Amino acid sequence: MRAPRCLVVLLVALLLSACSQQLYSGLTENDANDMLEVLLHAGVDASKVTPDDGKTWAVNAPHDQVSYSLEVLRAHGLPHERHANLGEMFKKDGLISTPTEERVRFIYGVSQQLSQTLSNIDGVISADVEIVLPNNDPLSTSVKPSSAAVFIKFRVGSDLTSLVPNIKTLVMHSVEGLTYENVSVTLVPGGAESDAQFTASAPPRPSPWPWLAGCALALCLAGAAALYWWPNPQAGRWGGWQRLRELKKGKAG
């Protein structure tokens, strides 16, 4: 009985793999949910699967919508860029860092956390924060001020101009010695104006009847193969055609 079962499993796997294609893998569940929501709103028959009981996730889309799906995700800044946090930057690795290395890692960690925070604002596709903390000489009379530059790419139709003062205040209070005037914010539009634009330009889905016909044909082939290789207890071997003769004799009788 193993041969028919293996054949059926193989046919089902081939049919499933032919229906969809993997877009991204190794995702967190939150990223997978965000991507799935965006794709569904854009008219894509997407799905998410996990190969390892929820540790990582993958997002799939129909073959005929792969290119369109990637365009939609790219316009929405998905999957989200992963930013390191201070805990990861200063995790114990058994090595002793120099004060200069510690300073660089701290500045980088703060900029990464700020970038992650700003990326969570509605309408933001991506955000990057660059921080400059001069290493001032304590014996010098001139002090170089700290500065920060914020770059935000946002979706067209999102009004982030009113949030610029709040963004500058957030960055100022996150960096020691930084003043409000030394924080610059650059806003750049990108992506689509709305999901309605993508929905209107979504490629038409083909009729499902060819797939249903293919599934029916595959099931018929699997049934015929199972019948052919059905075991014959009397002969002690696989007796497919002999089994057919027995069935015909039974009907005639």
Swiss-Prot record:
Gene Ontology biological process terms, A to Z: protein secretion; symbiont-mediated perturbation of host programmed cell death
Source taxon at top rank: Bacteria
Any one annotated GO CC term: cell outer membrane
Lipid group attachment sites (N-palmitoyl cysteine): C19
Keywords: Cell outer membrane, Hypersensitive response elicitation, Lipoprotein, Membrane, Palmitate, Protein transport, Signal, Transport, Virulence
Membrane-topology annotation of the record: Lipid-anchor
Localisation per UniProt entry: Cell outer membrane
InterPro entries from the UniProt entry: AMP-bd_C_sf (IPR045851), FliF_N_dom (IPR006182), T3SS_SctJ (IPR003282), YscJ/FliF (IPR043427)
Cystine pairings recorded for this chain: none
Record Gene3D superfamilies: 3.30.300.30, Hypothetical protein rpa1041
Signal sequence bounds: 1-18
Covalent lipidation (S-diacylglycerol cysteine), chain numbering: C19
Stated family: Belongs to the YscJ lipoprotein family.
Purpose: Necessary for both basic pathogenicity and the induction of the hypersensitive response in resistant plants. Could be a part of a specific transport apparatus or a secretion apparatus that is required for pathogenicity. Hrp proteins may form a complex (tunnel/pore) that enables the export of molecules such as virulence and avirulence factors.
Name of protein: Protein hrpB3
Organism, as annotated: Xanthomonas euvesicatoria
Gene behind the chain: hrpB3
